[in-house]
Amino acid sequence: MPLNEKVIGKQYKSDPITISQHESIYYALAYNEDNDAYFDNRRQGGIIAPPMYAVFYAAGPTAQLMFDAEIGINMMFVVHYSQYFEWIKAVKPGDEVTSEGTITHITVKEKGSILGWETVTKNQHDDIVVRAQWEFFDRSAGSGKPDGKTEEEAIPSQFIFDDAMKVRNGQTYIYAEPSGDHNPIHVDDDFAKKVGLPGIIVQGLCTMAFAHKMAVDHLTPDRDPLKVKELYVRFARPVLPGQMLTFKGYAIEKLAEKTKYGIIALNDSGKDVLRNAWCTVA
């Protein structure tokens, strides 16, 4: 069933959310984080919420959109297609944030349709803290017509970093709690198989959080998470619990006030799990 293109431009607004120290710390632990910026209150200025915690506090409009029957999306067949974050100002425990979202596009492809929307999140001072662009892929809404050719991602010969992350068995259950992503494909093996998946798959935003950690650990001075200004990923294939992921980073270009880096993420079979991923670092 095709998605309803008449919803393009439709807007949503979340209720205010107060950032919980307990939950922001829980979120950091849920993707194997070890950066004291998220844990050590003895630091000058205290702790910050992990930038990737925006997957929870900026997702209010997303939750509304998912249950909006007017769109025609079949959540049983939805996977995350791509994600972009721009972090503008630090978010700390105790802050109150509100998000507004707007549906921006619907793209019909052979094997499904892409639903895209953007969100803007502001704090209690009306300062914009995060901008985000989200895309879901509804596998039940394809055209059946072959897609045009896409450009292959250029693979560099030299890398700035090459590091690995072990996906824990049980990672999806741990990540589901603070992120709010309880989609059955992440926590119910039988359900995941019924909708054509090999079993439980890892939340795409958990894989993105791994990539963010790699960028902070290897591309910033003193592992400063506030130096990573943007991160974009497209999800290439499912990540499974127990897999070992390899992340590699390389320089793309020097911009006016920041540098753009590419990120490659591979599973233990050497297949890419993220595609066209990049970040900018101040």
Features from the language model and the residues they span:
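Short amphipathic alpha-helical surface patches that serve as generic macromolecular interface elements
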Residues: 208, 212, 228-232, 242-245
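Small/polar glycine-rich anion-binding or flexible loop at a beta-alpha turn
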Residues: 43-46, 227-240
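Short leucine-rich amphipathic alpha-helical surface patches
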Residues: 212-219, 235, 239, 249, ...
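Short, surface-exposed helix-loop/turn micro-motifs enriched in polar/charged residues
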Residues: 111-113, 223-227
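HotDog/MaoC-like acyl-thioester-processing domains
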Residues: 1-7, 12, 78-164, 239-282
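Hot-dog-fold acyl-thioester-processing enzymes
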Residues: 1-80, 143-148, 154-225
